[in-house]
Amino acid sequence: KSSMITEDSMSGVRVVYPTHRNEEQMGILLRAPEPDDRAIRFVLDSWCKTVAAEPPWNFGSTRHTPPPPHPLLIYEHDTILKKIIHKSTITLACDPDDPDTVWGYVCSDGELLHFIYVKSAFRGFGIGGCLLRSAGIPKGKMMISHRTESLFTAFPNIRFYWNPYRMIYGT
């Protein structure tokens, strides 16, 4: 099967059907978060917890010193993320019948992928790929500011280039 998205346009939001891995044709509502949206808190919380569980500078290295404790990682990363998200584009993947139910999101800045996340119960339905395509990042080499083992597992055929300074200093 080829990977494709069919869309139904609605005012400012899109319902997409990623047909490649979504046999049941589960619709996905793609939308931007509102400034006071509780989804922003979900984005910050899930992003920080993932980074604490899978620190980007950790894998593939031998540990000579213990990693920072999770509470410190979460606190410091939350500070970084609050700066990043105001300059970035966030797209939420939601339940079309309940736009407040968020299944996942992507955060990008132009051709830079900051982070992509899909709740574990909704992985394998093509939501992550749909979010990645919605970000408009060119195929092939992809610049990322955050790297996690989950990212490389979910997208094994994409060549990622990690630039952690983009996470700290922005674009």
Predicted regions and their residues:
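Conserved beta-strand in the GNAT
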Residues: 92, 99-117
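Short, Lys/Arg-enriched N-terminal segments with co-localized hydrophobic residues
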Residues: 1-9
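Conserved acetyl-CoA-binding loop-helix of GNAT-fold acetyltransferases
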Residues: 121-138
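Short, solvent-exposed loop/turn segments that connect beta-strands within catalytic domains
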Residues: 22-24, 96-101
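Active-site rim helix/loop that mediates acceptor-substrate recognition in acyltransferases
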Residues: 61-90, 95-97
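Short amphipathic alpha-helix that is part of the acyltransferase structural core
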Residues: 8-74
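Hydrophobic adenine-recognition pocket in adenosine-nucleotide-binding enzymes
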Residues: 33, 116-121
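Conserved GNAT acetyl-CoA-binding A-motif
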Residues: 137-167
